[in-house]
A protein has these predicted regions:
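Helix-loop-helix hairpin linking two adjacent transmembrane segments in secondary transporters
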Residues: 3-54
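Juxtamembrane intracellular "pre-TM" segments in multi-pass secondary transporters
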Residues: 55-80
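Extracytoplasmic gate region of multi-pass secondary transporters
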Residues: 73-131, 135-139, 185, 215-219
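A membrane-interface helix-boundary motif in multi-pass transporters
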Residues: 21-37, 218-242, 262
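Interfacial helix-cap and linker-helix signal at transmembrane-aqueous boundaries
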Residues: 14-27, 101-102, 132-136, 214-227
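A late C-terminal transmembrane helix in Major Facilitator Superfamily
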Residues: 191-229, 235-236
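C-terminal ends and interior cores of transmembrane alpha-helices
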Residues: 147-161
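Intracellular juxtamembrane helix-capping segments at the cytosolic ends
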Residues: 1, 179-193
Length: 263
């Protein structure tokens, strides 16, 4: 899955740069259409060429009782809360880092590369976190690198707004937060019955999307308040740490206080 998720990182590197040049050449409207046609073509190509690893089996219809079952499991609830909180901090960085770079006076030609730099770091982070997760335990790797993601926000992005610091932060945060993207599904699979992985994944991604949907207005309100950019950064960093802590509690419930347990 780590290898699979690098595809979106590659898109996150190429598309922002291409889109900037397209807007200058053909305007915003046709730039959006061109991107939409590219994505449509790639989706059609994937649907025509991908084959299931196992043949589809006859399955029973999922009932409301089955959909509610995961919410009676403490482990599931803990990781859902953790993912949801982390998404608030994660998307605050992704969406507002370029805006803050502009506000500090960074060269406009350099600002357009902030998100591609973050996604380039994320590409390698997704690969390494997936590989190390298989070797050392997926929960272990997720917890370590996501704690470090929150620490980078508070230790680097919060105190320093120089161009060099913002570029370094975008690369470091991208690398360490890559585990959040690539390990969501593996963490869920590890605590779920095989027959329920499909709809459980849908539930988790739906709930995470609520965080991604609401984080922008919340963060915008923080910036407009007296807290300003510092408030946004503290909010983002604390929620990344809090979200990771819920996943840590889920891990402790499973393994106890065995630090070296592979889980």
């Amino acid at each position: 899955l780590g290898v699979l998720f690098t595809g979106s990182s590659i898109g996150g590197i190429v598309l922002p740069i291409a889109l900037t040049h397209l807007i200058n050449e053909v305007g915003f409207g046709w730039s959006m259409r061109i991107c939409a046609f590219i994505i449509l073509f790639l989706l059609i190509l994937a649907n025509l060429t991908i084959r299931p690893y196992r043949p589809p089996q006859q399955t029973q219809k999922v009932t409301w009782a089955q959909l509610g079952k995961p919410f009676r499991e403490t482990q599931f609830i803990l990781i859902v809360i953790g993912f949801f909180l982390f998404s608030y901090g994660f998307f605050a960085v992704v969406n507002y880092l370029p805006v803050q770079a502009v506000s500090t006076g960074m060269n406009s030609n350099l600002v357009q590369y902030i998100v591609p730099i973050l996604n380039a770091g994320s590409l390698f982070g997704r690969l390494f976190s997936g590989f190390l997760g298989d070797k050392l335990g997926r929960y272990n790797i997720f917890i370590v690198v996501c704690y470090l993601s929150g620490i980078w926000i508070l230790a680097l992005w919060l105190p320093d707004t120089s161009t060099a610091a913002l570029i370094a932060f975008s690369a470091l945060f991208g690398f360490f937060s890559g585990a959040y993207v690539s390990l969501i599904t593996p963490l869920l699979i590890q605590i779920s019955p095989m027959a329920e992985i499909g709809f459980r994944t849908g539930i988790v991604l739906f709930l995470i999307s609520l965080g991604g949907l609401t984080t922008n207005p919340v963060n915008g309100a923080i910036i407009d308040s007296s807290a300003g950019w510092s408030g946004l950064k503290i909010f983002s960093g604390v929620l990344c740490l809090a979200g990771t802590s819920f996943v840590l509690v889920a891990r402790i419930r499973q393994t106890g206080w065995k630090v070296l347990a592979r889980f």
